[in-house]
């Protein structure tokens, strides 16, 4: 007889109440109301979700699980495999399940319904949506509309303390008035220093500001270190080096708040992983990259038909492995750019951008992508200047005359894939992922919380909580001074 992990573990009081509420909801004939399971890091959401899915399996319903990101889907697949559960439909992103079309708007992706969206849930009795805090209002509305005609039951699982979707003040899933809700408040996962730190930041037992320098706090369940900036960077580089040696990029990541800090940290991370070669080539074979924005069809020599959508080759936050790199001269004349005035203002004598073409792999998908020149390079400055000039011309032409000019602008912009090393991520991009060791940059923690407006205090609290709770084993912070050292030390040891 096959034994499953956690099979003999008893439920906490919170989990039992949630399980009972779910059972009652599952037996109701009216499936119109969704079920929302919320809980903080370590409260047992994944463990309980597997228990709930066993109930669904026993009921005979056709079911599947989805999440907003590919990384989060991978975590779900692993949990299902460990539990021996087999969904009716292969786990995927929610966008794929609902047959949504992704469109790029600036640096954001917007989802739109397609002809297949309305019938996407026709043969499914239940869908569990993990990492629900990342679901924005538009996506939530589409999911509810798709479920209604087929009486498909929707289960949302997420952490209300995480960052809300971009552009929204709160996660709309947890603000739904018409839903059956259950909340896991008791933290039951290993009470090591990592989870202790996350809990203390979430409930404000510790101030969300630059921490004091502390000796390492460690146990069999993990470690938290607060180091000066130099030691922190050295430790981060060593962690990345070891992760690369083990061919396990998820073993260590650096997380920061701003893109400016990310660009400053990337060279240090690349040197740690690739040595002297990092300074000689902007991209190297074997390097793990992440899509910083959606990659559109003009950036791929394979065309859009091999990607995720006809015009969109890859969504943002997709991790890729570089298999080969070659230089490329991108002739902008192919995109209608040849005017002397445009070229001279952009510092280009001829309509050519010197860049790289990378053969990349993501799972079974292989693509050849023209890369955006690296930040700070002459080619990048020329490209940015040209795009700025094209946008100015389009605005000056107005609505009637600017349509063709905007089309040319978007063709040039989308002709280059914006990729970056996955070793350094912003906290926002890290949501839905977990890593062995996490090195949190100092821009995540403000120096003085009291100087910030109330909404910014809440934001940094969520930011720090998400950063710390990405770690499975170890967290390393940048510290300064010794103020509040005693209270931090006690809190991390669970003495508060």
Tell where the protein language model's regions lie, with residue ranges.
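Conserved alpha-helical scaffold flanking the Walker A/P-loop in AAA+ ATPase domains
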Residues: 107-121
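Conserved helicase motor core of SF1/SF2 NTP-dependent helicases
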Residues: 14, 20, 38-43, 47-51, ...
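C-terminal accessory regions
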Residues: 333-496
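Generic structural signal for buried aliphatic residues
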Residues: 18, 289, 320, 435-438
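N-terminal pre-P-loop "Q-motif" helix
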Residues: 8-26
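Conserved helicase motor core of P-loop NTPases
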Residues: 22, 30, 160-382
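Conserved adenine-nucleotide phosphate-binding loops and their immediately adjacent elements
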Residues: 1-9, 38
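Short hydrophobic/aromatic beta-strand immediately N-terminal to the Walker A/P-loop
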Residues: 34-38, 64, 253-255
């Amino acid at each position: 007889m096959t034994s499953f992990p956690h099979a003999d573990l008893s439920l906490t009081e919170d989990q039992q109440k949630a399980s009972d509420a779910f059972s009652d909801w599952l037996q109701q004939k009216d499936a119109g109301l969704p079920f929302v399971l919320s809980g903080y890091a370590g409260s047992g959401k994944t463990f309980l979700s597997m228990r709930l899915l066993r109930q669904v399996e026993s009921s005979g319903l056709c079911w599947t699980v989805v999440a907003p990101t590919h990384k989060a889907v991978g975590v779900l697949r692993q949990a299902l495999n460990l539990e021996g559960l087999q969904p009716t439909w292969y786990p995927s992103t929610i966008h794929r399940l609902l047959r949504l079309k992704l469109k790029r708007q600036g640096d954001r992706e917007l989802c739109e319904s397609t002809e297949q969206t309305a019938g996407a849930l026709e043969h499914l009795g239940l869908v569990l949506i993990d990492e629900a805090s990342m679901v924005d209002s538009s996506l939530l509305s589409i999911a509810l509309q798709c479920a209604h005609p087929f009486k498909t039951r929707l289960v949302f699982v997420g952490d209300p303390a995480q960052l809300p979707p971009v552009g929204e003040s709160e996660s709309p899933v947890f603000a739904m008035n018409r839903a059956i809700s259950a909340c896991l408040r008791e933290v039951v996962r290993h009470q090591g220093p990592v989870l202790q730190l996350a809990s203390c930041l979430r409930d404000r037992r510790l101030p969300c500001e630059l921490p004091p320098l502390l000796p390492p706090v460690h146990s069999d369940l993990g470690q938290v270190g607060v180091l000066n900036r130099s030691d922190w960077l050295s430790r981060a580089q060593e962690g990345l080096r070891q992760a690369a040696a083990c061919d396990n990029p998820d073993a260590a990541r650096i997380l920061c708040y701003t893109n400016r800090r990310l660009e400053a940290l990337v060279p240090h991370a690349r040197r740690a992983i690739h040595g002297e070669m990092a300074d000689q080539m902007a991209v190297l074979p074997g390097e793990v990259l992440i899509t910083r924005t959606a990659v559109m069809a003009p950036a791929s020599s394979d065309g859009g038909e091999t990607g995720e959508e006809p015009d969109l080759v890859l969504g943002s936050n997709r991790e890729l492995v570089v298999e080969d790199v070659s230089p490329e001269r991108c002739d902008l004349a192919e995109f209608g750019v040849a005017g002397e005035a445009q070229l001279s203002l952009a510092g280009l004598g001829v309509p050519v951008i010197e860049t790289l073409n990378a053969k990349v792999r993501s799972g079974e998908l292989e693509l050849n992508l023209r890369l955006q020149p690296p930040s700070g390079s002459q080619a990048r400055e020329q490209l940015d200047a040209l795009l700025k000039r094209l946008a100015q011309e389009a605005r000056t032409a107005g609505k009637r005359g600017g349509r063709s000019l905007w089309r040319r602008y978007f063709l040039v912009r989308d002709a280059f894939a914006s990729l970056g090393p996955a070793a350094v991520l912003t906290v926002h991009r890290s949501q839905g992922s977990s890593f062995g060791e996490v090195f949190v940059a100092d821009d995540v923690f403000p120096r003085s919380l009291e100087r910030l407006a109330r909404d910014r205090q809440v934001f940094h609290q969520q930011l720090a909580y998400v950063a710390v709770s990405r770690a499975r084993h170890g967290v390393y912070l940048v510290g300064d001074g010794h103020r509040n050292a005693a209270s931090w030390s006690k809190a991390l040891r669970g003495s508060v």
